[in-house]
């Protein structure tokens, strides 16, 4: 029995919206691309950039941590990935609209906004992930203590739930916003803040300018198709990430022993992911703004996040699989229940 036995298909509306985004994006691309064939290649590139950006390390860590938090509160997290990606991609869309009405302004000011926005977005992402990592570290210690207590004495499931939910009290130390995330849609503003780094927005915007034609070479619908396709690709994988993590975590909520056992495993991964990614982001900003040199800072600056997100996805899924196998063949539930 899962936590959300009556909400098995709660993810369907989000998938339907993602499909609608695909239909709109590719329809706009087809309409505008009939007159400018080069737009087809640009549209596919925009969609690919969206797919790739969904695997950014900060996306994966933020979505998976929020899914786990909502499940602990017995809230449905099916839309976490969807709303995060919509908030993030809305920055791209707004930038494309501005480009559509004022191409010259974008050409003159975009580099400046890219620098400022990139700093803001990275700082928000880094601080948020470090705070989440510290919170999860405290949670991990409490879980280990609770698991040891469960081996020594019998604990009712209601008591376990109360202990798990009481960990939320720690959230008062990490600022007011994370406490306010009690529904899937609450992560939409967070996704927007993460998106304020105009690196991805500028990629899509510059695609609209890369044809080398005059300002009227690509229609407004053609320009709009690029951020919509970008959002389609990113929302597809982010939504699937949130849904997959929901059902992976639901395995852990079958009984008290399994619940604590799995939470120890996945929380340890969450701590590592959030702290490592958050600290690297903040250290890279520090090194850049203070012009720091040396072997350590050179190593920090050389770290690329392009493949780290893929590793995190695999790590979460492998952790869930290994936990299931150890649980089954190690007979942990039987040993702890005696």
Swiss-Prot record:
Keywords: Cell membrane, Ion transport, Membrane, Nickel, Nickel transport, Transmembrane, Transmembrane helix, Transport. It is a multi-pass membrane protein. It is found in: Cell membrane. Induction: Transiently induced in response to mild-acid conditions. It holds the Pfam family NicO. One of its GO terms (biological process) is nickel cation import across plasma membrane. InterPro entries: Ni/Co_transpt, Ni/Co_transpt_high_affinity. Disruption phenotype: Deletion mutant is impaired in its capacity to accumulate nickel. Nickel accumulation and urease activity are almost completely abolished in a nixA-nikA double mutant. The chain crosses the membrane at residues 11-31, 37-57, 79-99, 127-147, 187-207, 217-237, 266-286, 307-327. Its main location: membrane. Belongs to the NiCoT transporter (TC 2.A.52) family. One of its GO terms (cellular component) is plasma membrane. This is Nickel transporter NixA. Secondary nickel transporter. Required for full urease activity. GO terms for molecular function: high-affinity nickel cation transmembrane transporter activity.
């Amino acid at each position: 029995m899962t936590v959300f036995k009556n909400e098995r298909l709660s993810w369907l509306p989000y998938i339907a919206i993602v499909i609608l985004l695909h239909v709109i994006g590719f329809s706009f691309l087809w309409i505008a691309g009939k007159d400018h064939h080069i737009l087809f290649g640009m549209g596919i590139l925009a969609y690919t950039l969206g797919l790739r950006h969904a695997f950014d390390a900060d996306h994966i860590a933020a979505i998976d941590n929020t899914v786990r938090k909502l499940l602990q509160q017995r809230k449905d997290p099916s839309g976490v990935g969807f709303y995060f990606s919509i908030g993030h991609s809305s920055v791209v869309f707004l930038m494309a609209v501005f480009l559509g009405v004022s191409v010259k302004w974008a050409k003159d000011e975009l580099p400046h906004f890219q620098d400022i926005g990139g700093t803001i977005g990275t700082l928000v992402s880094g601080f948020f992930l470090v705070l989440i990592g510290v919170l999860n570290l405290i949670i991990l210690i409490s879980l280990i203590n609770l698991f040891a207590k469960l081996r020594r004495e019998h604990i009712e499931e209601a008591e376990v739930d109360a202990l798990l939910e009481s960990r939320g009290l720690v959230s008062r130390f990490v600022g007011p916003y994370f406490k306010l995330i009690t529904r899937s849609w609450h992560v939409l503003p967070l996704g927007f803040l993460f998106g304020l780094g105009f690196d991805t927005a500028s990629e899509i915007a510059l695609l609209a300018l890369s044809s080398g034609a005059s300002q009227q070479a690509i229609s407004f619908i053609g320009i709009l198709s690029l951020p919509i396709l970008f959002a389609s690709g990113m929302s597809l994988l982010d939504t699937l990430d949130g849904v997959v993590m929901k059902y992976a975590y639901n395995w852990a909520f079958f009984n008290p022993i399994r619940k604590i056992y799995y939470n120890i495993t996945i929380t340890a991964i969450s701590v590592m992911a959030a702290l490592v990614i958050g600290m690297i982001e903040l250290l890279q900003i520090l090194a850049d703004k203070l012009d720091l040199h040396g072997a350590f800072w050179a190593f920090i600056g050389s770290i690329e996040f392009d493949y780290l997100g893929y590793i995190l996805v695999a790590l979460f899924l492998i952790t869930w699989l290994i936990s299931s196998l150890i649980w089954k063949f190690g007979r942990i539930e039987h040993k702890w229940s005696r």
